[in-house]
Amino acid sequence: MPPKQQGPSKKSEQKRKEKVIEDKTFGLKNKKGNKNQKFVAQVENQVRNNNTRMDLVRQQEAAKKKEKDELLDIANLLKPVEQKVAKDVDPKSLLCVFFKQGLCGKGAKCKFSHDLAVAQKTAKKNLYADSREVEKDEETNENWDSDKLNEVVNKKNKNKHMIDIVCKYFLEAVENNKYGWFWECPNGGEKCQYRHCLPEGYVLKKERKAMEQQKEDEISIEELVEKERAALSSKNLTKLTLQTFIAWKKKKLRERKEKEEADLKEKKEKIKSGKHNGMSGRDLFLYDANLVNNDDDEAGDIEMEKEEVDENEKVFEIDANFFKFDGMDDELTDQMSKSSTAVESTAKGMAKMDINEDLFDIDEDVENLDSDED
């Protein structure tokens, strides 16, 4: 155990107090003035009771600190999660969760509301449900008084029911943004026989006007196509007709044929130089079939079951002529002559139809396109 702290003894403390009193009241004790005697008594009281008063102050401070520590511990135990709010939401429209639990010490400086009724103020009234009917459904006769009972009896005797027509004052209030919790109907208030709710699917005039404005701003697909067509420069582009499409198709087929011939030539050169990497079996077979059958002698014996084939079944034979592209231009010429005949017969039938000629207005002569492309 640590040694006890040795403080001044009571006798030495008493002597010290007497000396302090003598120093402060030197020459005043023998004076008989009332003020002097009160001053001497006050000094003696302060010096002799100073420790007692200081001890009392220390005890009060210790009690306050203990109470504060207890409140801090309780606050840490019951401390809610830090309250967050979106950017577009007013913090004063939300109740402070710390204040709700009695733990908020910010007071007026708190950015959140300390009004317990703020939730009721911010909640909007339902436009599609009559509050009187809702209260009537939730109401029971347990809390009725004599006045309420008489009112119910009189209503039952009169047999007066609510009309399904919507109250015109209610509609005006909704259209003018005046309807809310404190709105009262001019036609008798709660006793109004008309309904104070909008029917299902009803669209307000202000919303209808906004929808019409939005509909006017929208553009149809036909208008969008015409707009994009008008934006294109007709001088630098060729209009699409049957002749231009056939010429374009013929050009694409010729380009594909030339590309395939160039690729085949490149593959043959690779095979001649002994570079078989990246070559498929079909490419090797087309170049030389012996390159594929060289390993027949080295391969092992394989037993295979012969598949039964119907002798009367007709087989479609595919030979090298099937993939031959020679004379393609002649075939295209024949096809073009046949298609031109078909176009003439179709044009006779389309002459009877109403067609917007502006869509097919050809400003350039495309008869010499074939010769230009060749």
From Swiss-Prot:
Q: Which SMART domains match?
A: ZnF_C3H1
What are the record's GO terms for cellular component? Answer: cytosol
Region (Disordered) residue ranges read: 1-20
Respond yes or no to whether keyword S-adenosyl-L-methionine is given for this record: no
Q: Compositional bias of type Basic and acidic residues: which residue ranges?
A: 10-20
Q: Pfam families in the record, alphabetically?
A: DFRP_C, zf-CCCH
Entry's family note: Belongs to the ZC3H15/TMA46 family.
Q: What is this protein called?
A: Zinc finger CCCH domain-containing protein 15 homolog
Species in which this protein is naturally found: Caenorhabditis elegans
